[in-house]
Regions:
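Eukaryotic short linear interaction motifs
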Residues: 50, 75-77, 145-146, 169-170, ...
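Alpha-helical solenoid repeats of the armadillo/HEAT superfamily
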Residues: 65, 105-111, 129-135, 149-159, ...
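Flexible loop/turn segments at the boundaries of HEAT repeats in alpha-solenoid HEAT proteins
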Residues: 30-31, 54, 78-80, 126-127, ...
C-alpha cells in the first residue's frame, strides 16, 4: 500500500521499464508512478485498476512504447459511482463503457499493446484508437467487432497479432490474410472456454499461409480442423520427422518455401502428423512437443500450461525423460510463476516427484535442486488440500533430508508440522511424519531445540494419542516415537517437554496396548534412554512402576538386543546416581543390578545395531566411577560392540572424545569388574 508513491519523483529514482504484473495496488499508486517518463509498462492482471488509471497514463503518452493491460477489465469501463480511487470494479461487466478518455488514441508512440478479458460493451476499435506506430497487438478472450476491417489500419506496420480465445471468424481470417507484414499470428483457443468455433478448413489455412509470406510463428492450438487438412496415406512423404514444407503432412504448408520457426498445435488433431514443417512445435504426443508447450504457454496461459504439465507427468511416469533437465527447469518455472494457481500446483507438484527421482539426480545442479525445494515449500504453504500436500511431501522424499533442506530448515519444519496439526489422510500423515523424523535426525542441538519450540514434541504426542485411541499401531505410530527419540537426543529441553506432556503414562499405555510391537518398543526405549541421560530428569523415572517395567524389559529379545540394551542403558544411568537417589524404589537396586549383569551376558557382542550415535559423551560419563560397576560394564560393552561392528565410523569418534584415556584410567580401578576390564583392553 503506497509503495509505488516512493517513485513519484523522477529526480530521486528514474524508471523506464516497469512490470507490476498481478500486483494489487490502487489507481492513486499508479498515478504517482506516472510522473516518470515510462517506456514499457506491464499491468497484466492488475484487476483493481479503473479508468482513472488510464487517464493517469496519458501523462506518459509521449514516452510509452509498450503497454500490457491484459486482465484489467475496469480500465476501459467507468465504474458506477465515478472514477474516484475508492471505486471498485467488481461489477465492471454491467458498468457503462467509459467515454473518449477510455482510449489509447493519444498514445501515438505505442508499438506494443496487450489487452484482454474486456467487459461486454467495450468498443475495441474505440479503445485502441489509431496507434500509427503499432507493431504488435495482442487481444485475448475479448468480444471482437463483427467487422474486422479495423485491423487493416495497421496493415503496413503490424508484425505480431494475437487473437487468442477471440473466436476468429472466417471474416477475420480473410482480413488477417491482408496483413502482409505479419511475422507472428496467434488464433489459438482454450477448449475449456467452451465457445463455439468453426473448424478451420484446408482453404482457410492455405489462405493464411499464402497471404502471409513473412510468417515465422503460427499458433493454432485448441482449434478443430475440417477433413482434408492432412495428406492421405498415399501422399505421405517416405521420411518421418522432416521439417521440409514439401514433405509436410499438413497440406496447406506445402506452399511455403521455408519451415516456420514456431507452430502451435497443442490440443489439436494435427499434433500427431508425421511431418510438421516447423522447428518448434507444441503438442501432446511427444516429450519435445509437450516441453515446447509448457515453455510457450506458462507465462500468460496457466491453464494450458497445466494441461501440458499433466501430459509431461503421464510421460515421465511410464518412461525415462529424454530432456530431464529442461523438463525440471520448465516445471519449476511454472510453479514459481503461478504460485497461487491450483491447477498448476497440482500438476506441477505431481510431475516434480517423477522428475526428481534418483535416476536423474546426477543431472541436477545444486542451484536447481534448491529451486525445486523452494517451489515445493511454496506449494505446501499456499495449499492445504490433500493432493498438493501429498505430491509435495513425496517430492521431498527424493531429496537428502535434512542436509538439502538446511537453507530452509525452519520453514520446512513449520510446514510439515502444520500438515500434521490438521486432519488429513493417513497416507499424507505417514509421509509427513517420516519427513519430520528425518529432519531431526543428524542435526545439531540448536536445530533440535528450535524445532522443539515449534511444538514438535506436542504434535508427535498428539498423533500417538490418536493412534492409541484407535488401538492402531502402524508406521505413523512407530515413526512418531522414532521422531521423539531423535529430537530428544542430547537435548534436555525436549526431554523435559516430553515429561511435562505426560509422556511416561503415554509410554506405559502403548507398551500395554501393543506388547508384541518390537519396532515400537525399540523406539520408545530409545527415547526414554535420552531422558535417563539427563540427571535433573531422572527423578521422574525413579518410581517403582517405571523401574519395574524397565527391569522386566531387560529380558526382552525384541528387535535383537535393542530393547534390552536400551532398558539396560536407562537403568545404568539411574544406578549411577547412587543408593540415595534410588531410595525405597522396588525392585531393590542390587536386584536390578544383578538382572543387568545377566542381560549383558546374554547379548551377542557382534550384533549389528539399529542405532546411530553422534557422540559417546553419555556413555563415557559412566566409565570413570565406582558407584555402579554394572553401569560401567554396560558402557564398556556398548563401546566394544560399536567399534567391533562399525570400526570405521566409531573408532574416530571414540578417539576424538578422549575415550581411550578414560578406559585406561578405569583399568587401574579395584572396583571395576574383570569382564569389564577385558572388554576395555580390547577397545
Amino acid at each position: 500500500q503506497g509503495f509505488l508513491r516512493a517513485f513519484s519523483e523522477p529526480r530521486a529514482a528514474r524508471l523506464q521499464r516497469v512490470s507490476l504484473r498481478e500486483f494489487d495496488f490502487s489507481d492513486a499508486d499508479l498515478d504517482a508512478l506516472c510522473n516518470q517518463a515510462l517506456v514499457e509498462l506491464d499491468l497484466t492482471h492488475c484487476e483493481q485498476l479503473t479508468a482513472r488509471s488510464l487517464r493517469s497514463l496519458r501523462r506518459c503518452r509521449r514516452s510509452l512504447t509498450a503497454l500490457a493491460l491484459l486482465g484489467c477489465p475496469g480500465v476501459f469501463c467507468e465504474p458506477r459511482g465515478g472514477a474516484g480511487d475508492s471505486a471498485t470494479t467488481g461489477d465492471a461487466d454491467s458498468a457503462g463503457a467509459a467515454g473518449r478518455d477510455a482510449s489509447l488514441a493519444c498514445f501515438e508512440r505505442l508499438r506494443f499493446v496487450s489487452l484482454g478479458a474486456l467487459p461486454r460493451g467495450v468498443d475495441v476499435c474505440g479503445a485502441l484508437g489509431s496507434l500509427p506506430a503499432l507493431g504488435a497487438l495482442h487481444l485475448s478472450s475479448t468480444e471482437l467487432p463483427e467487422d474486422p476491417s479495423f485491423l487493416l489500419r495497421w496493415s503496413a506496420t503490424l508484425r505480431s497479432l494475437g487473437l487468442h480465445n477471440c473466436g476468429a471468424t472466417p471474416a477475420y481470417l480473410r482480413a488477417v490474410c491482408l496483413l502482409g507484414e505479419l511475422r507472428h499470428l496467434d488464433i489459438s483457443r482454450d477448449k475449456a472456454v467452451g465457445q463455439q468455433c468453426v473448424p478451420l478448413t484446408r482453404g482457410a489455412l492455405c489462405g493464411l499461409l499464402q497471404g502471409l509470406p513473412h510468417l515465422e510463428a503460427l499458433d493454432l492450438s485448441g482449434n478443430s480442423f475440417a477433413e482434408g487438412c492432412t495428406v492421405g496415406p498415399d501422399e505421405e512423404a517416405p521420411c518421418a520427422g522432416s521439417t521440409d514444407p514439401s514433405d509436410s503432412s499438413i497440406v496447406a504448408f506445402r506452399c511455403r518455401a521455408q519451415p516456420l520457426q514456431f507452430l502451435g498445435l497443442f490440443g489439436t488433431t494435427l499434433g500427431t502428423a508425421r511431418n510438421i514443417p516447423a522447428h518448434v512445435v507444441t503438442g501432446e504426443e511427444s516429450e519435445a512437443h509437450v516441453l515446447n508447450a509448457i515453455e510457450a504457454y506458462t507465462d500468460l496461459r496457466p491453464e494450458v500450461a497445466s494441461t501440458a504439465i499433466n501430459c509431461l507427468f503421464v510421460l515421465a511416469r511410464v518412461s525415462r525423460c529424454q530432456q530431464p533437465l529442461r523438463a525440471l527447469q520448465l516445471v519449476v518455472s511454472a510453479l514459481r510463476r503461478h504460485r497461487y494457481n491450483r491447477h498448476v500446483q497440482v500438476t506441477g507438484s505431481a510431475a516434480l516427484f517423477y522428475l526428481t527421482g534418483s535416476e536423474y539426480r546426477a543431472e541436477h545442479p545444486e542451484t536447481l535442486r534448491r529451486q525445486v525445494l523452494s517451489v515445493v515449500l511454496n506449494g505446501m504453504e499456499a495449499y492445504q488440500e490433500v493432493t498438493v500436500q501429498r505430491n509435495c511431501c513425496l517430492t521431498l522424499c527424493n531429496f537428502g533430508v535434512p542436509e538439502e533442506l538446511e537453507f530452509a530448515y525452519g520453514r520446512a519444519t513449520r510446514l510439515l508440522l502444520a500438515i500434521l496439526q490438521q486432519p488429513t489422510q493417513d497416507s499424507v500423515q505417514r509421509i509427513a511424519v517420516h519427513l519430520c523424523n528425518a529432519l531431526v535426525c543428524q542435526v545439531d542441538h540448536a536445530h533440535k531445540e528450535a524445532v522443539g519450540r515449534m511444538g514438535f514434541v506436542r504434535t508427535m504426542m498428539k498423533i500417538i494419542r490418536y493412534r492409541l485411541l484407535r488401538k492402531t499401531c502402524d508406521q505413523v505410530m512407530e515413526f512418531s516415537w522414532s521422531a521423539l527419540w531423535n529430537i530428544t537426543d542430547e537435548t534436555p529441553d525436549n526431554c523435559k517437554i516430553f515429561l511435562m506432556l505426560n509422556g511416561m503414562p503415554l509410554f506405559l499405555e502403548c507398551l500395554h496396548e501393543f506388547p508384541r510391537k518390537q519396532e515400537l518398543h525399540r523406539n520408545m526405549l530409545g527415547l526414554l534412554g535420552n531422558v535417563a541421560e539427563v540427571k535433573s530428569l531422572r527423578p521422574f523415572l525413579m518410581t517403582t512402576q517405571f523401574v519395574t517395567v524397565f527391569s522386566e524389559l531387560l529380558e526382552s529379545d525384541a528387535d535383537g538386543i535393542e530393547v534390552s540394551y536400551n532398558a539396560c542403558g536407562m537403568l545404568a544411568h539411574m544406578l549411577h546416581d547412587g543408593e540415595g537417589a534410588w531410595g525405597d524404589v522396588r525392585p531393590p537396586r542390587h536386584l536390578v543390578a544383578q538382572r543387568m549383569w545377566s542381560a549383558i551376558a546374554r547379548w551377542d557382542a557382534s550384533s549389528r545395531r539399529n542405532i546411530n550415535y553422534r557422540s559417546f559423551e553419555p556413555i563415557l560419563r559412566l566409565i570413570p566411577q565406582s558407584v555402579s560397576p554394572v553401569s560401567q560394564h554396560w558402557a564398556t560393552w556398548a563401546l566394544y560392540n560399536l567399534i567391533t561392528v562399525y570400526p570405521d565410523k566409531y573408532c574416530p569418534l571414540l578417539i576424538s572424545e578422549n575415550g581411550p584415556q578414560l578406559l585406561l584410567g578405569m583399568l587401574g580401578s579395584h572396583t571395576t569388574h574383570a569382564d569389564t576390564k577385558e572388554k576395555a583392553r580390547w577397545v
